[in-house]
Structures are given as structure tokens and as C-alpha cells.
Swiss-Prot record:
Entry GO CC: ribonucleoprotein complex; ribosome
Name the UniProt record assigns to this protein: Large ribosomal subunit protein uL5
Protein's job: This is one of the proteins that bind and probably mediate the attachment of the 5S RNA into the large ribosomal subunit, where it forms part of the central protuberance. In the 70S ribosome it contacts protein S13 of the 30S subunit (bridge B1b), connecting the 2 subunits; this bridge is implicated in subunit movement. Contacts the P site tRNA; the 5S rRNA and some of its associated proteins might help stabilize positioning of ribosome-bound tRNAs.
Species name: Flavobacterium johnsoniae (strain ATCC 17061 / DSM 2064 / JCM 8514 / BCRC 14874 / CCUG 350202 / NBRC 14942 / NCIMB 11054 / UW101) (Cytophaga johnsonae)
Keywords: Ribonucleoprotein, Ribosomal protein, RNA-binding, rRNA-binding, tRNA-binding
Oligomer and partners: Part of the 50S ribosomal subunit; part of the 5S rRNA/L5/L18/L25 subcomplex. Contacts the 5S rRNA and the P site tRNA. Forms a bridge to the 30S subunit in the 70S ribosome.
The organism's place on the tree of life at top rank: Bacteria
């Protein structure tokens, strides 16, 4: 039998039935699921130093285990000395098994390394069932060697779900193990 990530097994065995019971779904296909996780990182100083983009791409690749791509500007912004087509950030989109593996590492090893961590805020939902989480330091991930970090910077992590409402999405992510703060 092929390898399946722990969280994917847990989703199939426990989370689906819990969400069906909570929201009264009649069909398994109605149950919301995690579609993709997008990690993105803006590098504003890359206008003057091109190597910063390479560092950002390299760090996102180490964190996720999948090659990150650099993002480019769509238009000129004179006040930032930015031209159309210049690299300004990095992003990586995780789907399938890599997505579940990353979520497992985020929950079990990265988030507990955050200083004074008491759970994540539930204010990051967008009204359509997606959740945005901001990470202030990339060094919370065990894949990043603190001694080799060029500059401490954060990133945005977006959880895209098939849920129609924020309540469904929050229940899904909480069942998968994301530690939300108690109100």
C-alpha cells in the first residue's frame, strides 16, 4: 500500500464524519475539504538587491519541499522605483500530499516554536471559506538554519478550502488541528 500523509488519513477517517454530523450534510461530496495552501512572500528591498529574491525562493523551497517561483510586478510604480516585470516576491502553491505534509509540519513543529504562542486568531477568514495566516519570522520552521538566514522576514500562508462559509472553513481547519484562540 502506498504512503498517505497522517492528516489526509485523519481527514478521511474522522474529520468527514465530524463535519457531516455538525452541519447535517447528506452526501460526502458536500463536506468541505482543503484545496490548496499558498505560501507567498513579498521582498520590497529586491528593487535594489536582486539576490534577495533568490534567498526568498530558496527559503520557501526548503520550507515546503517544492520549488518556489518568483513573482513579478504588473505595472510601474515610480515612488517605489519599480518597473513592470521586475521580481518583487516569491510564492509556492501546495496541493495533494505535499499540502497535507506541510500542514502537519506547520501544526506540530512550526507554530509551537512561535514566542508566546497562544493560538492563531480567527479573524483571517475572507467570507468565502478561505483563511489567511501571517507568519512574522521564517525561522519558526525547522528546515531553516538560523545561522544562514540573510534577513528575518515573514510570509503569508493562505488555506483555500471548498467551504462556502467561514464557519464551515473554521470547523474544517480546527478539526484538522489548527490551534485557534478561544474567544
Amino acid at each position: 500500500m502506498a504512503y498517505t500523509p497522517r492528516l489526509k488519513e485523519e481527514y478521511k477517517s474522522r474529520v468527514i464524519s465530524a463535519l457531516k454530523e455538525e452541519f447535517g450534510y447528506t452526501n460526502v461530496m458536500q463536506v468541505p475539504k482543503l484545496e490548496k495552501i499558498v505560501l507567498s512572500r513579498g521582498v520590497g528591498a529586491a528593487v535594489s538587491d536582486k539576490k534577495l529574491i533568490d534567498y526568498a525562493v530558496d527559503e520557501l523551497t526548503k520550507i515546503t519541499g517544492q520549488k518556489a517561483v518568483s513573482t513579478i510586478s504588473k505595472k510601474d510604480v515610480a515612488s517605489f522605483k519599480l518597473r513592470k516585470g521586475m521580481p518583487i516576491g516569491a510564492k509556492v502553491t501546495l496541493r495533494g500530499e505535499r499540502m497535507y505534509e506541510f500542514l502537519d509540519r506547520l501544526i506540530t513543529s512550526a507554530l509551537p516554536r512561535v514566542r508566546d504562542f497562544g493560538g492563531i486568531k480567527a479573524t483571517g477568514f475572507d467570507g468565502r471559506g478561505n483563511y489567511n495566516l501571517g507568519v512574522l519570522e521564517q525561522i519558526i520552521f525547522p528546515e531553516i538554519d538560523i545561522d544562514k538566514v540573510n534577513k528575518i522576514s515573514g510570509m503569508d500562508i493562505t488555506f483555500v478550502t471548498t467551504a462556502k462559509t467561514d464557519k464551515e472553513a473554521k470547523s474544517l481547519l480546527a478539526e484538522l488541528g489548527l490551534p485557534f484562540k478561544k474567544n
